[in-house]
Every structure is written in C-alpha cells, then in structure tokens.
C-alpha cells in the first residue's frame, strides 16, 4: 500500500500497455460513478479525491487477527489533490477508529449489512467492498470520492522490489515478534517482505498502537516519494514498466480510475509538485473511554480538517507534530529542499492553530496574491514528504 501514492505518476506513464493486467474493476455508488465518468481529474471543482485501501484475506498474516474471516481494510488513506495541483494531502484513518458505516451489500457473497452507528472503519470493506469503504469515508468527511483502488500485500512486495528498495531511518531498534521484523538503529534499505513487515509493524514501533504504525508508515511513504522524485526513477522506462506491472496486477480499481485518460491526467496533476507540498496527516482521534483498544473521532479537530479539504484550501501542520512512532532525523538539515513558491509555507512548518467556533481558520493572502497555508490544529499529527524522519522502535 505504501507505494500506491506514487503509482498514479508511474503507472500513468505506461497505462495503456498495463491496464489490461489489472485483475478487475468495481463500480462505486451511482453518484460517484457519474462524477468519475463526466469529470476531468485534472480540473475537478474543489480538487480530486481518491480512496486507497490496503488489504489481505490471508488469515494470520503478520499482525492480522487470526479469527478474522474475509478482507478488512487494514490501511485506509484518502488522497486529496488540490484543484490548482499545488498540494497533495494524504489522510490516514486508523483501522481501530469507530465510525458510522452505511447499509451495504457484499458484492461477492450477497450478504446485506444494516447501517451501524459505531463500527470499526476496517469492517467497511468486508461489509460491502470498495464501494462501502468509499461511502463510509464520504459520510465521515463530507467529500465526494469518485476514484478508489485496493492493493494486496503481494502488490506492496512486488512494487518495493521494482523500486530497488526504500531507504528508511530507524531511531531506536525495532524487534517485532509478530511480524518477525528486526532492525537495528540506523539507515536500512527495505524491499520485499522486509518492506511489508515494516509497514505492517505495530507492536514493534512507538507505543505499539495502530496510531504509532500510521506515523511509521508516513516515514516510509515520505522516504519513498523523495526517492522517486530525486533519483530519476520516473524517467527510467524499465523501472516504470516493472512498477506499473507490479501495481496494476495486484490492484482492484474503481471503473473511473481504471481509465488511461484518468491515470495520465493524474500523472499530470502530480508532475512537478514539490515533496514539501505532499502532506501526510492522521485523521484526528481521541481514545475511546469505554475501550482502550479503539479510538473515536476528535470532533472539533476533524471538523476543521474536513472543512479545509471540502474548501480545497492549502494547509500546513504545526511544528513538531510527528506521530507516536516517528521523530526528526538527526541528518534532516543536510539536504534541504528549496520551495519555489515563497508565498507558500512548508507543509510541516505552519504555526499551531487554536481553531475557531465557526470552523477552520481562514488563510491570509500571500505576497503574490496566492493564499497562504491554513494551519491545521496542533492535535493533528503528520509530516510533509520533504521532512526527513525516523521510525522509533519500542
């Protein structure tokens, strides 16, 4: 799942030759289908939204629950690309987050599930496939999501291999008996099963929670994006072909996303975007007082995040907002990335926001007439892809 965020760029480069290798496509709700058919992803009013899901049906694989039947969305990431193509925001939803799930019918079994007012978000895929997961996140955020994709664990392994591995920093040793992952402190190049184990590791990082795993995944994602945008990966046709084949042969796409014009358009929206404008955030949550294994939506902070996404505002994170299992790399200042737009604050360097009673804070205009970044509440953790961070083992 980690490498899917760059697949829009890489896969689109040879989409015409590779789309046939995708296992199959799925339909979303009627409204989402119509939007995907009629809209141009490069010029969608309010920006483009894509839901990316990671799942595997193999019971007992690594850190999964051994009594689980069927697929669950272990990873749920909403990608918002601004209409002006100046920022990408990837919002990770904890799998242990309790949310309302609408009534859904499983497309494979025909089983109907009634609407639930409080259910774990990772149950939505099993209730009604990709479409149900999309409807769940739409209801939660108030956004329209016309595009979606699901990748299996095998896809993560093959795509990391195609890239020749991803370099990650480990601040404290990781020793996870559940995934078998053992990493000493320092730099590591991860691919194949090691890359998958790193992305799946929960017990080996931070405080052992799913929230810690999300911040560790953001370390990997950011390192991956820096790699593919800095070493010529996207201009290497051999690597692109391998990456595209690995992605599409292990992905299920919504009908609207499984179109050559859509993937090529997606590539054009990301082309030239600075990694400082690629922002990873965790959907804001609070502990469930009745069950410490679960979390609930932080209503105030979530409202602010939802509003800025709905209004397609450029955003920034407060200082020192890395997650539960990440910290700034000691070598972070050795290869600084310049920002070509002085009016835009770096995604990870905004001031903390106290919020307002009426919704998200307003963004002031920059010196060149471009709106400056709206700072997100300090309770929202994450980082930009340009920030060099390390995963903290426990």
List each model region and its residues.
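Non-catalytic, solvent-exposed segments at the cell envelope interface
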Residues: 1-394
């Amino acid at each position: 799942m980690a490498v899917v965020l760059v697949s829009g760029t890489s896969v689109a480069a040879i989409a015409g030759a590779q789309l046939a290798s995708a296992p199959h496509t799925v339909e979303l709700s009627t409204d989402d289908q119509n939007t995907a058919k009629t809209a141009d992803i490069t010029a969608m009013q309010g920006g483009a939204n894509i839901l990316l899901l990671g799942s595997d049906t193999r019971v007992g694989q690594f850190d999964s629950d051994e009594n689980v039947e069927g697929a669950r969305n272990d990873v749920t990431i909403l990608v918002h690309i601004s209409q002006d193509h100046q920022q990408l925001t990837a919002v990770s939803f904890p799998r242990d987050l309790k949310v309302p799930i609408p009534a859904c019918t499983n497309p494979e079994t025909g089983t109907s599930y009634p609407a639930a007012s409080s259910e774990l978000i990772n149950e939505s895929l099993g209730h009604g496939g990709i479409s149900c997961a999309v409807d769940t996140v739409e209801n939660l955020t108030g956004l329209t999501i016309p595009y979606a994709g699901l990748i299996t664990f095998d896809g993560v392994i093959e795509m990391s291999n195609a890239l020749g591995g991803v370099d990650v920093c480990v601040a404290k040793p990781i020793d996870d008996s559940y995934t078998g992952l053992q990493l000493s402190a320092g730099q590591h190049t991860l691919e194949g099963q090691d890359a998958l184990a790193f992305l799946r590791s929960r017990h080996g990082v931070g405080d052992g929670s799913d929230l810690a795993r999300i911040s560790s995944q953001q370390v990997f994602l950011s390192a991956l994006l820096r790699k593919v945008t800095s070493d010529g990966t996207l201009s290497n046709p051999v690597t692109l072909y391998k990456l595209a084949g690995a992605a599409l042969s292990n992905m299920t796409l919504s009908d609207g996303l499984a179109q050559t014009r859509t993937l090529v358009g997606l590539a054009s929206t990301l082309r030239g975007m600075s990694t400082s404008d690629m922002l990873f955030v965790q959907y804001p949550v609070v502990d469930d007082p009745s069950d410490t294994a679960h979390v609930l939506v932080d209503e105030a902070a979530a409202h602010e995040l939802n509003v800025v996404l709905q209004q397609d505002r450029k955003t920034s994170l407060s200082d020192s907002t890395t997650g539960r299992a990440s910290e700034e790399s000691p070598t972070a200042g050795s290869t600084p990335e310049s920002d070509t737009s002085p009016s835009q604050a770096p995604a990870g360097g905004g001031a903390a926001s106290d919020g307002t009673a009426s919704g998200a804070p307003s963004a002031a205009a920059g010196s060149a007439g471009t709106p400056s970044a709206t700072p997100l509440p300090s309770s929202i953790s994450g980082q930009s892809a340009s920030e060099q961070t390390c995963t903290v083992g426990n």
